[in-house]
From Swiss-Prot:
Cellular compartments annotated: Endoplasmic reticulum membrane
Gene Ontology CC terms, in alphabetical order: endoplasmic reticulum; endoplasmic reticulum membrane
GO BP term (any one): GPI anchor biosynthetic process
Full protein name: Putative GPI inositol-deacylase C
Protein species of origin: Yarrowia lipolytica (strain CLIB 122 / E 150) (Yeast)
Taxonomic path: Eukaryota, Fungi, Dikarya, Ascomycota, Saccharomycotina
Gene name tied to this protein: BST1C
PROSITE patterns in UniProt: LIPASE_SER (PS00120)
Length: 833
C-alpha cells in the first residue's frame, strides 16, 4: 500500500487564470495507480499547504483516515491537495491572494467533478497547514468564492491574527481585509454569510519555533459558537507540544484530526462544534442534547478519597470526581469504561426536584496522561453531578476543590502548601503575561491520588495536564501577549492533584526564548530607530567636521542612552493607554483600521505591544540590546568597506566634480543611464527591492573607493557616506524576504516577471540619491532635516514591529529630502558666485 498522487489535468486556464502557475492533485492510499479519468466518489477534503509547503504533506493524515475507515467503517474521504510550488506565501501578500483565488477555482472544479460523476456534493472541507490556513480563510472573503461551498476549515499552526513577517505592505492589507471580513460578518447576525461556517485552529505550543502560538487564536475573529482555538498539548491523547512541520505527521495529532474529519460529515454547525470540543478542547465538554431523569433512585455521594460505589445512581453538588475507569482508546466518544465491562456515565444537571433531575447533559470523558498508558477520566461540574454506575469495579474519588490565591515574587518565587483534598486550585492573580515561563516543583504528598498538575488560563483553550518528572514541570501559558487581542484579566491557574508542597519560580532561559519568538522583527525595527537617532546626532554635533558613525554612536551612548531607556519605559506605559493608542493610530501612515467583535478584548499593536509593568521593564533592555546591534552592524559594514578599499589602487585620484558644477549637466552624467535602465526594469519586471539591493551594493563599492582617499578635506564626506551605507545595508534586511520570493519564482516558475512591487516612486529617489553621492555633496542641516530624522526614528519605534515594510519607505522619504537639499546647496552656491 502506498500513496498515489494523481494530477487533476482538467483544471486548466479555462477554469482558472492561475492554472499554469499552480496545480491540483487527488491523493489516495492504494496498491494501484489511480485510474484515469479521476472519478471521486467520497467526501472531498482539500489540503492547502503553507509557506514553502508541499502538497505531499497530506500523506500521513490521508493514510490515517484510510486506516480508521477500514477499521470502523463510515464515509470514505477523497483527499485533494494543492501544489503551490512551495511558494513563500508568508512573505508576500500578492502570493497569498493568488493562492486564495486558485483555491476557490479548485473548489468549484472539484464540486463540478462530483456532479459530473452523479454525486450530490455541495461543499468541500478545507485542511490548511501554516499559511495554508490563512489562505483558506482569505479565500472565503474573495469575490470568486461561491457561498456554501466551504462549511468546515481545519487549520494547523496558522497565524490567523498577526502575519509572521511584516516586511511586505500587501500582506498587512491582506490580513486586515480578511479579518475585517470575518469580524464584520459575525457581528451582523442578520446578514451573516458565514452562519454555516465552523473553523478549528490548532497550535503546536512552545515547540513551534516558526509561528508564535498566540497568533493562532480565533477568539477575537470567530465567536465560540463557530470556532475553536486550542493547543496540541491540551488535546486528549496528544498531550505534547509539536514542531511546526511535525503538525502534519505527528501520529497522535493526525489520528485525532482523522477522527474529527470522519465525524463532522453531514453535521450542522452545532454538531460540528460538539465534535471539535470533544476531540480537541482539552476541557470538560458536554453534549448539546438535554435529557430528563424522572424518579431515579439516587444516593448522595460522600466526600472522600479512594471509595468504591456499588451499582446505581449517585448525585453531588459542586463536587469533583476522579476515577480509574478508562476510556476506550479507539474512540473519543465513549463513556468511562473498564475493560471488565463496568460502565460509568456522568451527567451535569441544571436542577433537582426530589428524585427527578432536569436539563441533564452528558459529560464527555476528559483524559489526562497516565503512567503505563493508563488513563484517568476526570469530571467536574458547578451544578448537580449525576453518576450512573453499572457495577462496582474500581475506585472513585469524590471531593470539593480547594481554592487558593497566591502572591508571587519574581526573584524568590512562591511556595504553597496544598490541602488534604483531591486537588487544590491555586490562582496567581498577578501572573497574566504569556511572555514568562515558570518551573513548578511538587513535593510528594500523602494522597493515594497520583500527582500531576493541570495548568489553565481563561484565554482560549490553554488547558494542559503536566506529569512531574523528578517532581518538576515546565509551565508556560498563553496569557496577555503582545500584538494579540486579549482579555483584560487572564491569570495563571494551577490545579495540583495529589497534595504536597508546590514551589513556582521563573524559568529565565525559557522566558528569553519567549521574548525572541515574539520580538524577532523588533530587533530589526528598533535598531533602525536608533540609527536614525544617531544620524540626527551627527547633524547636530556642533563641530566643523561631520562626525564618523563610531564617534556619534559613542556620543549617543554617553549622553542619550540613559535618557532613551527612560523614554522607552515611558512610551511603553503610554502606549498601554487606549487614548494614546487611538491618537497614534490617527496619525499613523498608512492608517490601519480594525473591526472588533467583542469590546472586552484589548489590542495593543504599538511599540512593544504591551501594557502595564512588563513593557516598562522590557523597553530599556531592548533599547540597550538594539544599541549593541547598531555597534555590531556598524563595525561589520565599516570592516567590509575597509577591506574593499584595499582593492583600489592608492594612486587613483578621485574625479574632481566640483560643487560648482552645473546641476543640469550633473543629471546628464552617464550614471543616470544606469538609473534609467533600472527604473524601466522595475516598472516591467523587477521588484523595487532588487533595485534597492543593487543600489546598496553600488554604495558599498563607492564608499570603499572614497575611503581609499585619505585627504583630510574628504573626511567629512567619507563619514557621511559611511552612515548612509550602514542605513541602506540595514534596510536591505527589510527588503530581503520579498526579494527571496522573486528569486524563488525565477527558480521554480522560470519567470522574471513579478506580480507586485513595481512602484517606481518607492525606489527612484533612492537611486538618484545614491547617484548624487558620487558628487561628494553633504547637505546642510536644517530644522526640517532634523524633524524628518526624528519622525523616521519615532515611526520605526512606534510602528516598526507591525509595519516593518515602512522602514524602507522611511529611508526613501529621507533620501528624497537629502537629495533636494544637496541640489539646493549647489543652486545657492552658483547663484552667489
Amino acid at each position: 500500500m502506498w500513496v498515489a498522487y494523481s494530477p487533476i489535468e482538467g483544471l486548466t486556464t479555462e477554469h482558472s487564470r492561475l492554472a499554469e502557475k499552480y496545480s491540483l492533485y487527488l491523493v489516495k492510499s492504494t496498491p494501484y495507480d489511480i485510474p484515469l479519468p479521476v472519478r471521486p466518489s467520497g467526501v472531498p477534503v482539500l489540503f492547502v499547504p503553507g509557506n514553502a509547503g508541499s502538497y505531499r504533506q497530506i500523506r500521513s493524515i490521508s493514510d490515517t483516515c484510510r486506516e480508521l475507515n477500514e477499521q470502523y467503517g463510515g464515509s470514505e474521504i477523497d483527499f485533494f491537495a494543492l501544489d503551490f510550488n512551495e511558494a513563500y506565501s508568508a512573505l508576500h501578500g500578492r502570493t497569498l491572494l493568488d493562492q486564495a483565488e486558485y483555491l476557490n477555482d479548485a473548489i468549484n472544479y472539484i464540486l463540478q467533478m462530483y456532479r459530473d460523476n452523479g454525486k450530490d456534493v455541495s461543499s468541500v472541507m478545507l485542511l490548511g497547514h501554516s499559511m495554508g490556513g490563512v489562505v483558506s480563510r482569505l479565500a472565503i472573503s474573495l469575490d470568486n468564492y461561491k457561498p456554501g461551498t466551504v462549511t468546515t476549515i481545519f487549520t494547523l499552526a496558522s497565524p490567523h491574527l498577526v502575519p509572521p513577517a511584516t516586511f511586505d505592505g500587501d500582506i498587512q492589507k491582506v490580513y486586515n481585509r480578511m479579518n475585517d471580513f470575518w469580524r464584520s460578518n459575525y457581528a451582523d447576525s442578520d446578514n451573516n454569510s458565514l452562519s454555516d461556517m465552523t473553523v478549528l485552529s490548532i497550535a503546536g505550543g512552545k515547540r513551534d519555533t516558526m509561528v508564535p502560538s498566540d497568533y493562532i487564536s480565533l477568539d477575537s475573529v470567530v465567536p465560540s459558537s463557530h470556532g475553536l482555538s486550542t493547543f496540541s498539548n491540551s488535546i486528549n491523547r496528544v498531550w505534547t507540544g509539536i514542531d511546526h512541520d511535525a503538525m502534519m505527521w505527528c501520529h497522535q495529532l493526525r489520528r485525532q484530526i482523522a477522527i474529527a474529519l470522519m465525524n463532522v460529515i453531514d453535521r450542522d454547525v452545532n454538531g460540528r462544534m460538539e465534535v471539535f470540543r470533544k476531540v480537541f478542547s482539552g476541557t470538560q465538554t458536554l453534549s448539546d442534547a438535554e435529557e430528563d431523569f424522572e424518579d431515579v433512585e439516587v444516593t448522595p455521594v460522600k466526600h472522600g478519597l479512594h471509595q468504591k460505589l456499588e451499582s446505581g445512581w449517585y448525585y453531588g453538588e459542586n463536587v469533583q470526581v476522579m476515577t480509574t475507569h478508562t476510556v476506550n482508546q479507539e474512540s473519543a466518544f465513549e463513556s468511562y469504561e473498564m475493560s471488565s465491562g463496568s460502565l460509568l456515565r456522568a451527567f451535569e444537571c441544571r436542577s433537582k426536584s426530589g428524585s427527578s433531575f432536569k436539563g441533564c447533559r452528558k459529560i464527555f470523558p476528559l483524559l489526562v496522561p497516565g503512567s503505563n498508558d493508563a488513563v484517568i477520566a476526570f469530571a467536574e461540574t458547578e451544578h448537580y453531578l449525576l453518576l450512573d454506575v453499572s457495577s462496582s469495579s474500581d475506585w472513585i474519588s469524590i471531593d470539593q476543590v480547594s481554592q487558593k490565591s497566591a502572591s508571587f515574587d519574581f526573584v524568590t518565587g512562591a511556595t504553597i502548601s496544598t490541602s488534604n483534598t483531591i486537588s487544590t486550585d491555586i490562582s496567581f492573580p498577578k501572573l497574566t503575561s504569556g511572555l514568562v515561563s515558570y518551573k513548578v516543583s511538587v513535593s510528594k504528598g500523602v494522597q493515594l491520588v497520583r500527582q500531576y498538575v493541570q495548568q489553565n488560563s481563561s484565554r482560549v483553550y490553554d488547558s494542559k495536564y503536566l506529569v512531574p518528572h523528578n517532581g518538576v514541570v515546565d509551565v508556560s501559558f498563553h496569557g496577555d501577549v503582545p500584538f494579540v487581542p486579549y482579555f483584560q484579566s487572564s491569570p495563571l491557574h494551577l490545579q495540583v492533584f495529589g497534595g504536597g508542597h508546590v514551589t513556582i519560580r521563573v524559568d529565565w532561559i525559557g522566558s528569553l526564548g519567549n521574548l525572541f519568538m515574539r520580538y524577532r522583527i523588533l530587533f530589526i525595527s528598533l535598531p533602525s530607530a536608533i540609527l536614525y537617532a544617531i544620524f540626527l546626532v551627527q547633524f547636530h554635533a556642533g563641530t566643523a567636521r561631520f562626525l564618523s558613525l563610531r564617534q556619534s554612536t559613542s556620543i549617543f551612548i554617553n549622553r542619550y542612552l540613559l535618557t532613551s531607556c527612560l523614554a522607552g519605559s515611558g512610551i511603553a506605559y503610554l502606549t498601554g493607554l487606549s487614548q494614546v493608542r487611538d491618537f497614534l493610530h490617527l496619525i499613523q501612515i498608512p492608517i490601519t483600521k480594525t473591526f472588533a467583535v467583542d469590546p472586552s478584548y484589548t489590542k495593543n499593536d504599538l511599540f512593544l505591544g504591551l501594557s502595564g509593568v512588563s513593557g516598562t521593564v522590557l523597553a530599556p533592555i531592548f533599547t540597550v540590546f538594539s544599541t549593541g546591534m547598531v555597534v555590531l552592524i556598524t563595525e561589520l559594514v565599516m570592516g567590509l568597506t575597509s577591506l574593499l578599499s584595499f582593492c583600489f589602487k592608492s594612486t587613483t585620484t578621485a574625479q574632481s566634480e566640483s560643487e560648482s558644477g552645473d546641476p543640469i549637466s550633473d543629471l546628464l552624467h552617464k550614471r543616470t543611464v544606469f538609473v534609467a535602465v533600472i527604473s524601466v526594469l522595475v516598472l516591467l519586471f523587477f521588484p523595487y527591492q532588487l533595485a534597492f539591493t543593487l543600489a546598496t551594493v553600488a554604495l558599498l563599492v563607492m564608499t570603499a573607493y572614497f575611503k581609499s582617499n585619505k585627504a583630510p578635506q574628504e573626511q567629512s564626506f567619507n563619514n557621511y557616506i559611511s552612515t548612509i551605507c550602514v542605513l541602506m545595508t540595514w534596510t536591505c534586511i527589510i527588503n530581503a524576504p520579498v526579494l527571496a520570493v522573486w528569486i524563488q519564482g525565477i527558480v521554480v516558475q522560470r519567470s522574471m516577471t513579478f506580480s507586485s512591487h513595481h512602484n517606481l516612486v518607492s525606489i527612484l529617489p533612492t537611486l538618484l540619491f545614491v547617484e548624487n553621492l558620487s558628487f561628494r555633496r553633504i547637505p546642510s542641516g536644517s530644522s526640517i532635516t532634523s524633524l524628518l530624522l526624528a519622525y523616521t526614528s519615532l515611526h520605526c519605534l512606534f510602528y516598526g514591529m507591525m509595519q516593518a515594510f515602512m522602514i524602507h519607505h522611511g529611508f526613501n522619504l529621507l533620501a528624497t529630502w537629502l537629495l533636494c537639499m544637496s541640489y539646493k546647496k549647489v543652486f545657492f552656491k552658483s547663484k552667489h558666485e
